[in-house]
Amino acid sequence: MLLNNNTNTNGNYTMRQLKLPLEIEKLIDISDPVYTFCEVMDHIDLSRYFVEKGYKTGRPRCDAQKLLKVILFAFMENGICSLREIEKLCRNDIRYMYLLDGMKTPSFATFGNLIRNELTDSIEQIFEDINSYIFAKDHVDLQHTYIDGTKIEANANRYTWVWKKSCVKNRQKVFDKISLLIDAMNREVLGYLGIKFEKREAYAVDYVSELLTMYKETTGLDETSFVSGRGHRKSIRQKQYEELHEYLERLKSYAYHIETCGEERNSYSKTDHDATFMRLKRDYMGNDQLLPAYNLQAAICDEYIAVIDVKPYASDMECFVPLMEKFNRTYGHYPKYPVADAGYGSYNNYLYCEEHGMEKYMKFTMYKKETTDKKYHENPYRAVNFAKDADGNLLCPNGRKFLFKRTQHVKYNKYGRTEELYECESCEGCQHKQECCPRAHKNRTIRMNQELTAIHQEVLQNLESIHGALLRMNRSIQSEGTFGVLKWDKAYKRLLRRGEKNVILELTLISCGFNLYKYHNKKQRQTKVA
């Protein structure tokens, strides 16, 4: 016989009745990242990052330390987080309520003001203090540093380029036009007044401005009497004055563009003057054009970001020295083993490592071809494979001598690098000419630098050793893995701020969040193993 059991196990409640827990943290899981975050923050003196303003009027200010905790935790959990999203989380997520500790939910503008006014100058010190605690707890090895760089698209309009070479070329055209105009002025107007303007090969803005003022005063021109439009005929003096004024404005524009580019760049964006146009791997427009971007450099130690830097250079070679100098300023020493890919292996960087006691574990340009292409490595027509006679002269595969011709300096080299130029005594009638130098119409010449060749041999020995193989493997995992997490896992592919200072602020916040989350993950793995 079936019994009709109508027992109601639901409690009697109403949805509209207010019922809150006495302690919010009891609802948060014990393995939640917020507890690891609070552990790190409790060991850092946050008050020293903020200067007391001493306001005596107006509403009480929001607690800057709580706001900083909320911002850092948002970057820790999400990688990159908009200010409006942070405000939304503070209203709906009990973990952010726990961090605010009863404070009224701040608006997105409040977070923006704190980042802009307080963190711009102190964010790097905050990053160092976070790393100091994490590195001490996790026993991070700062002697083995894995270096890599990536290009991140700037928050600039895509078609706002300014090319330095175009400005230089067009400025020269303006110089030529000014010379022609001065000839016309001297011939048609100033000659009758007994005055003659001097021509030059290049015209400074101040000189052209002085000419314009002198022309106006000498000819007695009054700009209020200038005519324009249909039915009016301009005088010769007005035409020449307006033409020279136009050239002056163009010279000012070119001078500003060239000065903004500086000596180390060839382009910049009109909407972000610190961004440089570079070729990115992510060509989403499909037209193979350059995009405004920054070169992000990171030094990784035991999976943590130890140092981060931003440079406007498209090449990684020029970024190595500034990154190592920043590492030294931060930690008080240089890493013993800086490991990097072939983009960093230059003569200057190798000598820099020697000067500062660092081992050479950076690949050079032809490293992969040298180690994997046996045909290239054993090619008898390469100069490094040439034999030598008793006098030390190089001998080609046909036994002909290469005679020393001269020593020449390599341009743009900080350490005064030189290379030796050798020329074959005679390539006439050589049976190996087609394989040795098919394009040469004269005797073959080769350029060699014995010091650089010796450095490459040392690098090969270092990288092909067991220790070097482990370092190469770890570099691929740690440095490239870091950018993989940021770009793909966190979907961070374009900057949100403009200007180099603001870009460094944004990337340092992301690095703080990355290290905090990495520390939490390692801590959880150790807990599970235990």
Regions found by a protein language model. Name each.
Residues 29-75, 448:
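Basic, short loop/linker segments at the boundary and entry of helix-turn-helix/winged-helix-like folds
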Residues 5-8, 54-58, 467-470:
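A ubiquitous short alpha-helical element
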Residues 71, 79-91, 101-530:
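Anion-binding and metal-coordination hotspots
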Residues 1-21, 207-210, 214, 384:
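Short, flexible loop/hinge motifs at secondary-structure junctions
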Residues 21-23, 30:
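Carboxylate/His-rich catalytic cores and anion/metal-binding grooves
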